[in-house]
């Protein structure tokens, strides 16, 4: 009698931290370079989008049980928050910031992320739960879009376009992460599927109905107050200035 190989392996394997980061760096870097070549963004915006896309590539692991990965992820989030706050203070409020304030503000933002936001996430999340879902990525993307929109001049079409791009890069990085996790759940050499298959790339964590409902309501609200889309679609549809090779 011929025995069939087991469908599920006893030990789960998933993409590690470096794989997630490096893949997100490559793909989002190429994407931002493409937008730069087409004239949709300038170099400063391209670098910022690349940074956000790389963070998006780590975003689902914000519920990680690994303290080292969690430290790195939250440090990157804190850095992003610090840069956004300083950008808002110096460009939108148009005030001079003293040396002491330049030290105190980042420390306050970092402390808020580390001692308030992080414990909340650790308390309400489990690994490969709500954070490993399309609903969570969409929520984060729309939230990033809204924050960027509010921190910039809302009267210009360029601001709306850039706001949508920031959210898009967060979403792109997150999708890369989830796809990698699912790819690592399939053993192509033995044609077997690991037990972790299907736990990463899912619409929502329906086991946690309260968080899922809250996420849906938040997404609906963010869509309602989102920046205009028509100008963004029109701008990003023009690829006449794109140069692949000069």
Model-predicted regions and their roles:
Residues 2-246:
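N-terminal membrane-targeting hydrophobic helices
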